[in-house]
């Protein structure tokens, strides 16, 4: 991938960009094998990769510069702003949106937030695109609601320029910290969720629900999990840290009982909407802490699927699973280091199958799917 921003030394986010993709994949596979070196692995499946550029469905832009000449991108460590509208990780469909947003910021009088001076209103622009219909969700992250009326007044112009904007919100983030979003979300459109579709499974994206940023690889990850589950004698499963339900909705069959648990209510609302559309009545999604939910149960299903954040599932949940001993555990991880640590805490299990998914090209990060079987 050629990147003018990298070549000019203006952005170093893609640290592996100079390595060809096959080399990147080999290095990631070697890292994963090294992390799992203490465990016998029955089957290493071939790594899965996707496009090397234009693959991201989401842009998180720090807004800086002036209200007349805003910059959308990032701040360097010394506070110097960098415009990243030309980043080749974004699809071509993002360029016209960025181009229209800059004059809109001036029209609406949304003064960019100045970190050094702690002044200004507009902190971030968050843009998400649906692969299924090209619809977009746009979120303005503001310090307060001071400019809300001005923004509402100017909005029809932006909607006329960009009819693909299906969901538009304002998020209020009042704290002087590098936190992407606050708790308050104000909808400026009637539509509140973006429709997405992976492998004929309807998914929904709401403002405060996590969704994978590489749809081409994420859809293969979900399809692989579905294929693995279909090969197992499973009638009842848990989907812990389930997010918008991607794994559970792919794996469920009409006669399977499935419980999906996720702490974010917005994500659970998405999962319930998808389950209703699919007519899957034996699926239950609840907004709870996954560890607290699991450890309070007196019995476990045949399969527990976990998809935790980078920190892993942690010792309390590992201890519970070791004691309760479900027949199968599928572990989806965005941090193989913590996954390996967790597997060490599950001594009664052997690794049947491992597959690497290159969700984050040009970086050292990757996703991994592991099937653990009770010995």
UniProtKB/Swiss-Prot annotation:
S-adenosyl-L-methionine binds at residues 212, 241, 262, 307. InterPro entries: 23SrRNA_MeTrfase_RlmC, MeTrfase_TrmA_AS, MeTrfase_TrmA_CS, SAM-dependent_MTases_sf, U5_MeTrfase_fam. [4Fe-4S] cluster binds at residues 3, 11, 14, 87. SUPFAM superfamilies: S-adenosyl-L-methionine-dependent methyltransferases. Pfam families: tRNA_U5-meth_tr (PF05958). PROSITE patterns: SAM_MT_RNA_M5U (PS51687), TRMA_1 (PS01230), TRMA_2 (PS01231). It comes from the Bacteria. The active site is at 334 (nucleophile). Keywords: 4Fe-4S, Iron, Iron-sulfur, Metal-binding, Methyltransferase, rRNA processing, S-adenosyl-L-methionine, Transferase. One of its GO terms (biological process) is rRNA base methylation. One of its GO terms (molecular function) is iron ion binding. The keyword Transferase applies. It catalyses: uridine(747) in 23S rRNA + S-adenosyl-L-methionine = 5-methyluridine(747) in 23S rRNA + S-adenosyl-L-homocysteine + H(+). Its EC number is 2.1.1.189. Belongs to the class I-like SAM-binding methyltransferase superfamily. RNA M5U methyltransferase family. RlmC subfamily. Catalyzes the formation of 5-methyl-uridine at position 747 (m5U747) in 23S rRNA. NCBIfam families: meth_trns_rumB. This is 23S rRNA (uracil(747)-C(5))-methyltransferase RlmC. It comes from Escherichia coli O81 (strain ED1a).
């Amino acid at each position: 991938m050629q990147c003018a921003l990298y070549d000019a030394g203006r952005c170093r986010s893609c640290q592996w960009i100079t390595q060809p993709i096959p080399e990147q994949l080999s290095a990631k596979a070697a890292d994963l094998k090294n992390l799992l070196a203490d465990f016998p692995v029955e089957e290493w499946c071939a790594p899965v990769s996707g496009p090397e550029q234009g693959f991201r469905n989401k842009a998180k832009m720090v807004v800086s510069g002036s209200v007349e000449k805003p910059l959308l991108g990032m701040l360097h460590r010394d506070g110097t702003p960098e415009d990243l509208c030309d980043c080749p990780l974004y699809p071509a469909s993002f360029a016209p949106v960025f181009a229209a947003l800059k004059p809109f910021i001036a029209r609406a009088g949304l003064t960019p937030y100045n970190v050094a001076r702690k002044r200004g209103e507009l902190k971030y622009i968050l843009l998400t695109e649906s692969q299924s219909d090209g619809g977009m969700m746009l979120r303005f992250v503001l310090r307060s609601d001071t400019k809300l009326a001005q923004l509402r007044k100017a909005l029809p112009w932006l909607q006329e320029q960009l009819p693909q904007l299906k969901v538009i919100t304002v998020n209020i983030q009042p704290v002087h910290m590098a936190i992407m979003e606050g708790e308050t979300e104000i909808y400026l459109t009637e539509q509140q969720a973006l429709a997405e579709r992976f492998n004929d499974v309807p998914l929904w994206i709401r403002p405060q629900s996590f969704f994978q940023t590489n749809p081409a690889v994420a859809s293969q990850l979900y399809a692989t999990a579905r294929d693995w589950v279909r090969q197992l004698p499973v009638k009842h499963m848990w989907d812990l840290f389930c997010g918008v339900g991607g794994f559970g909705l792919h794996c469920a069959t009409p006669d399977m009982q499935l419980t999906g648990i996720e702490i974010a209510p917005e994500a659970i609302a998405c999962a319930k909407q998808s389950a209703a559309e699919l007519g899957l009545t034996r699926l239950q999604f609840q907004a709870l802490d996954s560890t607290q939910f699991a450890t309070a149960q007196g019995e476990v299903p045949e399969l527990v699927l976990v998809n935790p954040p980078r920190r892993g599932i942690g010792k309390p949940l590992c201890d519970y699973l070791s004691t309760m001993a479900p027949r199968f555990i599928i572990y989806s991880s965005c941090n193989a280091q913590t996954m390996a640590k967790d597997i060490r805490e599950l001594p009664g299990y052997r690794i049947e199958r491992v597959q690497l998914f290159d969700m984050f090209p040009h970086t050292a990060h990757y996703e991994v799917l592991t099937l653990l079987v009770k010995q």
